[in-house]
């Protein structure tokens, strides 16, 4: 009988029980190493839907008109009717009456045809059609009911109902936004990100402090427990915050669980019946009914009502003076004085010692100052008007002005310069006649042509020599010189120091 020797199986041999056990242990260790703490469910904030600016304003206007101004359509119809009546546009008046006065809903207690009362714009209601009768605000509906908006075409009506039919104003603003609002929000987020990046030392340190505290609270593994302690694993009693309580206003106490539940239950809402005035007709009916209910119980002066016999009230004995208990509607007498306006000093003082409002009269100094200011302003207005008239006359006149007119139109400084420096006189210049001892006699003939006009400023005056032409002879006569010769020959170039040496 031969004995067989069995060799022990090595753990590395595949398919053996030992290798399978080691493989299972390795998988468990890897799974344990990769184990992570489950995080809380992250709630993704729903981004609002972006609408165009025109669509956003249009839909929001529909909601505001529907919830807060349901009578706006009727008021517009009344204004159109009154405008057509003032223009005597009978065609438009008939169209408005047909649109707003004939359509009525059955079951509301009103007739479907009110031709007799159609002339009054006060009876206008919102037009009702058979296709949209369910979406039109009813005149007798309660104030808390939310009517639906109406559009002209079926397509726009369907889009309007899809967007704003079942949404309030707050819900619409949370669900939709405009392009401008979205762009502004992106600008704000970009600016905040740049601010955090610029002051990263302040913002990141708060995050690092929270991570360090979490790391200190964690239990180290078995392998690292006998190593040197981590210097960062130190528990700090104070949490680091950027907005500390010393430099900023401290935060309040956190809400308890009960307070959080109460805040969650309290939802913000708008009472639409408080945003509009109640119907006066209903209030009148209620007041009349209430008054009728109270009259049998309380008579005049608080006395009890008279008893009834077989359904008839007992009458009181007539009073010799029937109007004694009532204040008269009209009276007679003499007027003590004619009413007049009370000035500031005549205002009666209040009998109480409390503060009272009183306008003081202007002082004498203030009245004088006001009078002087008015006088100066009137003078300035007159001067300004005269200057404007002169400038307008000078610009618009095609005539050539004389030296006197030109000198009068100048400013005082220009007049002083013209008379003092340039030698221009305001009066007509006197031409000096030549003396008998000065040369030859002048022969005056009918053929002499001489210019008597004064030369214009800025033009050089030619020499005073005139050629006398006669049919018989050509004789040249010297007319002499005057005091104004070469007066206006002002050098155009300013002299320098070298010109005098």
UniProtKB/Swiss-Prot annotation:
The keyword Phosphoprotein applies. It is found in: Nucleus. The modification Phosphoserine is found at residues 409, 411. Residues 152-163 have a biased composition (Basic and acidic residues). One of its GO terms (cellular component) is nucleus. Residues 1-18, 105-115 have a biased composition (Low complexity). Residues 126-151 have a biased composition (Polar residues). GO terms for biological process: mRNA splicing, via spliceosome; nervous system development. This is Splicing factor ESS-2 homolog. It comes from Drosophila melanogaster (Fruit fly).
């Amino acid at each position: 009988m031969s004995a067989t020797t069995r060799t022990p199986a090595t753990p590395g041999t595949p398919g053996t029980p030992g290798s399978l056990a080691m493989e299972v242990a390795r998988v468990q260790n890897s799974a344990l190493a990769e184990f992570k703490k489950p995080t809380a469910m992250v709630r993704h904030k729903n981004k609002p839907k972006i609408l165009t600016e025109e669509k956003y304003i249009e839909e929001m206007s529909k909601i505001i008109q529907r919830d807060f101004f349901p009578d706006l359509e009727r008021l517009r119809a009344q204004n159109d009717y009154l405008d057509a009546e003032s223009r005597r546009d009978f065609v438009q008046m008939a169209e408005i009456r047909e649109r707003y006065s004939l359509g009525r809903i059955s079951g509301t207690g009103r007739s479907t045809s009110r031709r007799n009362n159609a002339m009054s714009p006060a009876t206008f209601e919102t037009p009702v059609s058979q296709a949209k009768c369910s979406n039109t605000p009813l005149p007798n509906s309660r104030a808390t009911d939310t009517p639906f908006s109406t559009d002209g075409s079926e397509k726009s009506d369907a889009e309007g109902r899809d967007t704003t039919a079942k949404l309030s104003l707050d819900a619409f603003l949370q669900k939709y936004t405009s392009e401008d609002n979205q762009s502004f929000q992106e600008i704000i987020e970009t600016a905040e990100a740049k601010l955090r990046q610029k002051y990263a030392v302040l913002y990141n340190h708060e995050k690092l402090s929270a991570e360090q505290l979490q790391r200190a609270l964690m239990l180290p593994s078995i392998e690292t427990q006998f190593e040197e302690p981590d210097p960062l694993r130190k528990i700090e009693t104070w949490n680091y915050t950027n907005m500390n309580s010393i430099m900023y206003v401290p935060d309040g106490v956190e809400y308890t669980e009960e307070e959080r539940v109460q805040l969650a239950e309290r939802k913000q809402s708008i009472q639409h019946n408080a945003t509009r005035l109640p119907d006066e007709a209903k209030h009148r009916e209620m007041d009349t009914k209430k008054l009728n209910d109270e009259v049998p119980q309380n008579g005049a002066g608080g006395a009890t009502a008279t008893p009834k016999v077989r359904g008839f009230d007992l009458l009181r004995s007539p009073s010799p003076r029937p109007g004694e208990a009532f204040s008269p509607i009209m009276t007679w007498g003499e007027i003590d004085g004619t009413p007049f306006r009370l000035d500031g000093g005549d205002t009666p003082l209040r009998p109480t010692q409390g503060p009272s409002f009183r306008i003081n009269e202007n002082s004498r100094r203030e009245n004088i100052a006001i009078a002087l200011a008015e006088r100066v302003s009137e003078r300035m207005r007159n001067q300004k008007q005269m200057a404007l008239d002169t400038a307008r006359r000078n610009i618009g006149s095609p005539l050539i002005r004389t030296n006197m007119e030109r000198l009068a139109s100048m400013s005082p400084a220009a007049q002083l310069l013209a008379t003092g420096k340039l030698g221009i006189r305001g009066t007509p210049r006197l031409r000096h006649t030549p003396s008998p001892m000065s040369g030859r006699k002048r022969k005056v003939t009918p053929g002499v042509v001489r210019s008597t006009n004064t030369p214009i400023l800025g033009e050089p005056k030619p020499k005073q020599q005139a050629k006398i032409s006669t049919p018989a002879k050509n004789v040249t006569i010297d007319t002499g010189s005057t005091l104004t010769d070469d007066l206006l020959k002002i050098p155009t170039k300013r002299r320098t120091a070298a010109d005098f040496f």
